[in-house]
């Protein structure tokens, strides 16, 4: 029988000092026999997805204590990618994931906590906490802050739905008036919560539900809706049950590595492909798998991407549907139900409730369930009132979206396309793979051939696009923006956004060893591995070189002879210590970022630390 970790600090005469300190936090004699459960919060006033979390840790803690545990809350950092976007702040976004994972490990191991409830929401916070959970392998339940309501405004006598990306595109579009741009800006992000489309934050919260580590409804139920409160209460209750299952019944199925095993990772990736999730999810799933010693790599993603159809299309790939519409159609479980009926899921997986996939679908799939309470939960809708408060409204859709032919979620037979929403491309430009969000690519751009316009920083590319130096037919190449080369693997949302605002969104391609925001759409290929700073061929591309992109055949090639490439490589190596670094880039890189770059792997490994350099 496993021993409660917390007994290390609460039992034995030699721990009198530790107990004295525990007493100073409010613990009593009765508490020293109970499990100590960390409530890992991420409240901050910097991030709309986290601004409402201040009191939600207390809500979970009260439920933990009512259920027989001792709750101890702490906070992690949280970076808002949208606010950090387009300037040097974006260098810190991906590295913050590792700091979050480390901070959770430090706090939980230093204080010998027995289990965790992770209150996450936005882009790097959920992945960082997921990495820590699989690294620590103690009982855990995730409950996120929930999605933002979609923005809505009236333009040209028509009501339109909006999100953050619309504000960015129209703000840079010279054909949009100042008044309309300001109106869109003021309407795009109306409430607290993670940005309203299938961007990285919502994608990861959906994947956590598919991994089995979050409760049904977690990925799609709006942050503002009163129904979401129950998820926090249930998380506090169930984590105590999960903890006792492991420590008192020796049930290892309660541990995250047992729940989020390889079969669950395959299901999560299958969901991601079917819903056209953010390309960042590939990076984060690969990183989490490494932390949990799970045999899941980019070849698995490639294999799955070739057979999974695109069943759910959401902003930024369309403005018709946002997360509130996914929820109305049945949320994550609704998509999983269609994937299961298509024979595309591993059915033996279990979630934190102890339910296997068929049991979960029977209870929570709106197409199957007879539970009116579940149907009511999935009818939770937006109020359209600006607010930063959680659980502040109880509006409902008049009916669920169960139209699987033309609705938000579709059957395999009526899929948006039989090709999934994500694809892995290989070729001499990305020998270890690159990622494209096919859900956001125009059908006429699935094959593309054009001359390269090469830039050694995102800033130079943005200046060229806005300055009219990029024209229709070009392949914009942005290199030395990978995990090492950036460092920090910046998101390229501004270059892709400005291509759209300049009318080039469907007539240009973009290739980078950096990554993309979940808000990116268009022919945008990222994560080129190996990256330029690691000697990848992307470092040898020159202006005017022809690049061939063939998404149906999962291929991408630099059309330059082997002899010429060998000569270019020799010339690069002749630069000595300056080889595989940008030739002309002004960028201040802090020691914190240099430390990250020193250990960072390329994107095909999840941009995690290179463990071979750490020994042990």
Swiss-Prot record:
List N6-carboxylysine occurrences by residue: 124
Write down the InterPro entries for this protein, in alphabetical order: Dihydro-acid_dehy_C, DihydroxyA_deHydtase, DiOHA_6PGluconate_deHydtase_CS, ILV_EDD_C, ILV_EDD_N, IlvD/EDD_N
Its BP terms in the Gene Ontology are: isoleucine biosynthetic process; L-valine biosynthetic process
Reading the lineage from the top rank, the first entry is Bacteria
Give the Pfam families listed for this entry: ILV_EDD_C, ILVD_EDD_N
Provide the GO MF annotations for this entry. Answer: 2 iron, 2 sulfur cluster binding; dihydroxy-acid dehydratase activity; magnesium ion binding
Pathway(s) annotated for this protein in UniProt: Amino-acid biosynthesis; L-isoleucine biosynthesis; L-isoleucine from 2-oxobutanoate: step 3/4; Amino-acid biosynthesis; L-valine biosynthesis; L-valine from pyruvate: step 3/4
Binding sites annotated in the UniProt record for [2Fe-2S] cluster: 122, 195
Question: What does the record give as EC number?
Answer: 4.2.1.9
Location of the active site:
517 (proton acceptor)
Q: Which cofactor does it need?
A: [2Fe-2S] cluster; Mg(2+)
The cofactor note from the UniProt entry for this protein is:
Binds 1 [2Fe-2S] cluster per subunit. This cluster acts as a Lewis acid cofactor.
Q: Which UniProt keywords apply?
A: 2Fe-2S, Amino-acid biosynthesis, Branched-chain amino acid biosynthesis, Iron, Iron-sulfur, Lyase, Magnesium, Metal-binding
What are its GO cellular component terms? Answer: cytosol
Which residues make up the binding site for Mg(2+)?
81, 123-124, 491
The record's catalysed reaction(s) read: (2R)-2,3-dihydroxy-3-methylbutanoate = 3-methyl-2-oxobutanoate + H2O; (2R,3R)-2,3-dihydroxy-3-methylpentanoate = (S)-3-methyl-2-oxopentanoate + H2O
Q: How does it assemble?
A: Homodimer.
- Return the similarity comment: Belongs to the IlvD/Edd family.
| Biological role | Functions in the biosynthesis of branched-chain amino acids. Catalyzes the dehydration of (2R,3R)-2,3-dihydroxy-3-methylpentanoate (2,3-dihydroxy-3-methylvalerate) into 2-oxo-3-methylpentanoate (2-oxo-3-methylvalerate) and of (2R)-2,3-dihydroxy-3-methylbutanoate (2,3-dihydroxyisovalerate) into 2-oxo-3-methylbutanoate (2-oxoisovalerate), the penultimate precursor to L-isoleucine and L-valine, respectively.
Q: Could you tell me what this protein is called?
A: Dihydroxy-acid dehydratase
Q: What are the top taxonomic ranks of the organism? A: Bacteria, Pseudomonadati, Pseudomonadota, Gammaproteobacteria, Enterobacterales
Gene symbol?
A: ilvD
